[in-house]
A protein has these predicted regions:
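Structural WD40 beta-propeller signal
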Residues: 61-63, 110, 150, 192
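Surface-exposed loop and turn segments in beta-propeller and other repeat-based domains
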Residues: 19-49, 89-98
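Short coil/turn segments that connect the beta-strands within blades of beta-propeller domains
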Residues: 65-66, 112, 154-155, 195-197
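Conserved beta-strand element within WD40/beta-propeller blades
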Residues: 68-71, 115-117, 157-160, 199
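Signature of short aromatic-glycine-proline-rich micro-motifs recurring in repeat-based ectodomains
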Residues: 38-59, 101-108, 185-186
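Single conserved hydrophobic/aromatic residue that forms the stacking wall/gate
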Residues: 1-7, 11
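Short loop/turn segments that connect beta-strands within beta-propeller blades
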Residues: 13-16, 80-83, 126-130, 171-174
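Surface loop/turn motifs at the tips and blade-to-blade linkers of beta-strand repeat domains
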Residues: 48-49, 97-98, 136-139, 180-183
Length: 199
């Protein structure tokens, strides 16, 4: 995996030479169905740009070198030694079984266990990424940038977080007390002073 201000590329060694495999505008040209951009936001690799300077991870299954994981904004998997890659779930599709939160900083195998570190916490797979599970429950790791609460009724709170969306609390109404109303970053939340049921 190579990253610079001009390129984000994946290289594969075949024999004595290294050859460009995929990702981004340099040196293989604009992204398309064959030259996918794994550092971008789209799950088909069709967009130009990305966050390779911020999210850059690579892991190879220690028991099967055909299984390669690349992390950028999204998680990508190859089952054919890097010949092709697919994105099992876009960064904004948490309902899918292969979902990993956006902005993947590290991917590591420990035996058969596969771990991901990303802006959304820690994710885990016991089957090389076919199913991925959130492992951050019970960890107080969300950084609130700002939030609002009802002036009369303190049961309603709306807060903006760093990389974990906008979170709403309404007493004990939601699972784990909070509901994510929007993804990404938000620096604040507002609750109507006149009607605390409007946030």
């Amino acid at each position: 995996l190579q990253s610079s201000s001009a390129a984000s590329d994946v290289y594969k060694r075949q024999g004595d030479n290294w050859s460009f495999q995929c990702c981004g505008p340099h040196p293989a040209g604009a992204p398309d169905s064959i030259n996918i951009n794994m550092m971008g936001w789209q799950p088909d690799g069709s967009d130009d740009g990305g966050q390779y300077y911020y999210d850059l991870a690579l892991a190879v299954n220690p028991y099967d070198a055909n299984i390669i994981h690349v992390g950028g904004v999204n998680h990508w998997i190859s089952y054919d030694n890097g010949l092709t890659f697919s994105c099992p779930a876009k960064w904004s599709e948490p309902h899918k079984k292969g979902y990993v939160h956006a902005d993947i900083h590290d991917i590591n195998y420990f035996g058969n266990d596969l771990w991901f570190a990303c802006d959304g916490g820690i994710f885990y797979s016991d089957n090389s990424g076919d199913s991925i599970y959130k492992k951050q429950f019970g960890i107080a790791g969300t950084d609130f940038w700002g939030f609002g609460t009802g002036f009369v009724d303190g049961e309603i709170m709306l807060g903006g977080t760093y990389h974990n969306g906008t979170l709403l609390k309404d007493g004990n109404t939601y699972l784990n007390d909070w509901l994510c109303t929007d993804g990404g970053d938000n620096i604040r939340g507002f609750v109507n002073f006149g009607n605390p049921r409007i946030a």
